[in-house]
Amino acid sequence: MRVILLGAPGAGKGTQAKFITEKFGIPQISTGDMLRAAVKAGTPLGLELKKVMDAGQLVSDELIISLVKERIAQPDCANGCLFDGFPRTIPQAEAMVAAGVDIDAVVEIAVDDEEIVGRMAGRRVHLASGRTYHIQYNPPKVEGKDDVTGEDLIQRDDDKEETVRHRLSVYHTQTKPLVDFYQKLSAANAGKPKYSHIEGVGSVDAITAKVLAALS
């Protein structure tokens, strides 16, 4: 089964991706990992990619699609794969269709922007240990201090409200249109890929149950 997981940053895709890959025994494929692996392996495509990246240029959709086709032909993808952060744009999605890369299921995890801002902007981290807290859902015993060491907690730049809002606005401009694209593709192709919209609010277990039901 080949699955695309859509959703804004902070919607909980990473958590659900882990459950999906374990349940179906399929690898999670990210373009970043694929790029690094191809360059390291020194394949003809890898060498071409290295040239582009060394020149500080953006890797074209055409090269990325070639990379995807090379990756999904590998033995560990025999039962399918989960695409992580790809496609990001309509041209990439169209290129996948044109290249004959069939997708079985597209799952959108939908979470309201304000909920995401609350989730992410409330995170606090103890850098030395990696322990994470949340000012609302999982607060430390003493405000701003790590429970174990009593050292200061910090808010990572990625979790600051203005950064979160910027990432959400990029998502709505670039990636949200994929929701319409795959809904229309599914309707035009007698339900292939199967498209599912899931509300990503509630307990992790409840959301996982909905995601797995959508894929069964």
Swiss-Prot record:
Q: Where is this region: NMP?
A: 30-59
User: Per UniProt, what is one GO molecular function of this protein?
Assistant: ATP binding
Q: In which pathway does it act?
A: Purine metabolism; AMP biosynthesis via salvage pathway; AMP from ADP: step 1/1
Its localization reads: Cytoplasm
Q: Which InterPro entries does the record associate with it?
A: Adenyl_kin_sub (IPR006259), Adenylat/UMP-CMP_kin (IPR000850), Adenylat_kinase_CS (IPR033690), Adenylate_kinase_lid-dom (IPR007862), P-loop_NTPase (IPR027417)
Give the transmembrane region(s).
none
The UniProt keyword set, sorted, is: ATP-binding, Cytoplasm, Kinase, Nucleotide biosynthesis, Nucleotide-binding, Transferase
Spell out the Gene3D superfamilies in the cross-references: P-loop containing nucleotide triphosphate hydrolases (3.40.50.300)
Q: What is its EC number?
A: 2.7.4.3
Q: Which reaction does it catalyse?
A: AMP + ATP = 2 ADP
> Among its keywords, does the record have Hydrolase?
no
- Return the annotated region ranges for LID: 122-159
Predominantly, its location class is: cytoplasm
* The UniProt record lists the keyword Kinase: yes
One Pfam family this chain carries? ADK_lid
Q: Which SUPFAM superfamilies match?
A: P-loop containing nucleoside triphosphate hydrolases (SSF52540)
GO biological-process terms attached to the record: AMP salvage
The text the record gives for the protein's domains is: Consists of three domains, a large central CORE domain and two small peripheral domains, NMPbind and LID, which undergo movements during catalysis. The LID domain closes over the site of phosphoryl transfer upon ATP binding. Assembling and dissambling the active center during each catalytic cycle provides an effective means to prevent ATP hydrolysis.
Which family is this protein grouped under?
Belongs to the adenylate kinase family.
Q: How does it assemble?
A: Monomer.
Q: What is this protein called?
A: Adenylate kinase
> From which organism does this entry originate?
Pseudomonas putida (strain GB-1)
